[in-house]
Amino acid sequence: MKRFHVHVAVADLAQSTRFYSAMFGASPSVQKDDYAKWMLDDPRLNFAISSRGNAAGVNHLGMQAGDGAELAGLHARLLDADSTVTAEKGGSCCYARSDKYWVTDPSGIVWESFHTLESIPTFGGNAARSAMPENTAKAACCG
């Protein structure tokens, strides 16, 4: 089952972690020095914050696929949207290795469709960023 994803760049990670923990009524499922993530079931949401953005605010939005078949379906929808889609296979970002597709909507909002393959011990970096349109690369997860 798919899960909505939001990644927000924050100015103060500790203060933001306390705020969102209280708001969601849950502690982060992943917490690092520069990153925190809540995997919520109600609402079905993957909400992440990090101190790695250029400015505080929404970094990107996305859809997390439950498996490779769901990701293929999301990819097909992105292609149907007549947008430039950038593939990132086995990308390392946000303490996870994932297969991803990046797209920018007509208003310049960056969207990520992804399937997480495994957790990794480092924040990582986007190998595909150099192939992305400039506005997408600037806002992508590891910006």
Language model region names:
Residues 11, 50-52, 66:
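Residue-level recognition of strand-loop junctions within catalytic nucleotide-signaling folds
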Residues 13-14, 62-110, 118-121, 143:
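Vicinal oxygen chelate
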